[in-house]
Amino acid sequence: MMRCGLLGEKLGHSYSPAIHAQLADYAYGLYEVAPKALPAFLTGGDFDALNVTIPYKKAVIPYCTGLSPIARRLGSVNVLVRRADGTLYGDNADAFGFEYLVRRSGIDVAGQKALVLGNGGASATIQAVLEQLGAHVTVISRHGPDNYENLDRHADAHVIVNTTPVGMYPNTGRAAVDLRQFPQCAGVLDIVYNPARTALLLQAESLGIPCAGGLYMLVAQAKRSCEVFTDTVIDDAQILRIHRLLRQEMENIVLIGMPGSGKSTIAALLAERLHRPVLDSDAQVVETAGMSIPDIFAAGGEDAFRARETAALAELGKRSGAVLATGGGCVCRAENYPLLHQNGTIFWLQRDLALLPKDGRPISQRSDLAALYAQRAPLYARFADAVIDNNGTPEETVQKILEVLA
């Protein structure tokens, strides 16, 4: 069996092993190698083929006796293959991956002014692909002539591409630029894939600008890497299949609805059925506050509780592959929407008001439920990706959610 893997200095969690397991039958490991140990690893390491990530995409080039034309032109290698004679051959699959992302997004870059945010390791490849597709590229960096202090020069940009790690997990909720500075912007791409929707993409969505994240690029470059590893041709349909599988695994299932509408019950059943962790924003608030929700209301009122709730959602919403039950009033703060939507599909559980319990729920106890529902229903609708009737059995509700996800 071939010995393949991902080479980098600090890898943390990687989706690459799961992607390559879908592509071919070879072992795929993670190789964290310190810079001082890189020469010995490349010359004597026990591997047949590798993907290469930061900070080694340029550092491996002197150890290659052969380079593909694209790797030579870009001066960047993210695929290494050990030949039969023991020498290393370098290639670049990132270019294929980014071009696939552009085409899949439907964003037309030909003849358009494209701003590339960042001049780090991925930027040169992205610039080359955009230029090849006919875009007029300007690079925005922290210290170059075109920088974040003079973005007003580029208000006519039509396409924005983020190549920086700004907004990447775990530091979500941040964006390198404010898209309102670019009134002619007609497309936004972000090569970050975790979270699925970065703050930049969320703003693009809110402004009605076509946009796409980096997961397509990640899967497409893995497919191209596998072709180089195994000297075979793989149908591009595999990219779509694996992308769909990953999205399903990474996406949170978020439940919203009135207090007592069954969110915690349904979350527990979904988590058991799908073998996912279950998260609860009310439980997170109680844990961090060190007191019950009624006590929080008694001590500081609803505003104090809502502030704690938003902090809890900021922490829980950036996780992935979980089932998240929220408090009934989380929709009262607009800033909670991106926290839930960045990695989640949001389901509004609807239940007849007569069936809703009030015990232990301060807002429900103080308010007329019909009036509370009338106030919140438009907010639930604004947050929700899907509406689920929860007047049947819990098992029936779970099945309805699974059908939507399928």
Name these PLM-found stretches.
Residues D146-A212, C330-N336:
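Rossmann-like adenosine-cofactor binding region
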Residues L240-Q248, I253, L269, R273, ...:
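NTP-dependent small-molecule kinase module
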Residues A283-H341:
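ATP-dependent small-molecule kinase phosphotransfer cores
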Residues K263:
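Conserved lysine of the Walker
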Residues G8, N92-A95, V102, I107, ...:
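Glycine-rich adenosine-cofactor-binding loop
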Residues M2-S105, P195-R197, L201, L207, ...:
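Phosphate/diphosphate ligand-binding glycine-rich loop within oxidoreductases
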Residues V192-E251, N390:
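Adenosine-phosphate binding glycine-rich loop
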Residues Q342-L379, A386:
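A glycine- and Lys/Arg-enriched "phosphate-lid" helix/loop adjacent to the NTP-binding pocket
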